[in-house]
């Protein structure tokens, strides 16, 4: 809705954007998956940027803190999913990282700018560097999932969870990689 508001300039979208953004307030506390980054980024971050909603600043920073709890320093990545629950638990993963996670970096960079805390920046850069080193094939297509050993940083597996095959190029994932 925020992007529709931005593209059209039509103020009729503003109350809807605010309403649906503020319904996501509790998301700032999610620590069990990486989606908090783009859920808050696409809503609160856009509202902060487009409508000068200064009150969104604290939500953005809190969400970045929640996302940062998923950072695995020895592997240099933000873990996407918990590997011990649900369907993810059946894959044998230890520290799965999906290319979608690149969408979260904007939130971390903005949280650094808003808070002055370079921890968020450092996590974003380290995650991006590690992703560049291990998610991409020689033809520059990317894997959907790279599983790491969270203690050593060693790559355990390169797979897909939603694409056609482990070695296929997944269009949506390619877009997320470019965005990040």
Label each residue range with its predicted role:
Residues 1-180:
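Glycan-recognition and catalytic cores of secretory/periplasmic carbohydrate-active enzymes
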């Amino acid at each position: 809705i925020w992007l529709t508001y931005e593209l059209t300039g039509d103020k009729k979208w503003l109350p809807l954007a605010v309403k649906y953004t503020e319904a996501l307030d509790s998301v700032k506390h999610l620590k069990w998956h990486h989606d908090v980054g783009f859920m808050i980024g696409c809503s609160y971050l856009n509202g902060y940027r487009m409508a000068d909603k200064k009150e969104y600043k604290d939500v953005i920073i809190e969400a970045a803190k929640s996302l940062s709890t998923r950072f695995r320093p020895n592997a240099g990545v933000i873990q996407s999913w918990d590997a011990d629950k649900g369907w993810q638990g059946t894959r044998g993963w230890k520290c799965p990282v999906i290319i979608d996670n690149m969408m979260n970096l904007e939130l971390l960079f903005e949280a650094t700018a808003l808070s002055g805390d370079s921890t968020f920046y450092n996590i974003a850069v380290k995650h991006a560097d590690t992703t560049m080193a291990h998610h991409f094939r020689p033809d520059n297509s990317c894997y959907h999932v790279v599983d790491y050993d969270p203690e050593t940083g060693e790559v355990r597996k390169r797979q897909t969870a939603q694409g056609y095959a482990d070695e296929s190029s997944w269009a949506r994932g390619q877009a997320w990689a470019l965005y990040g």
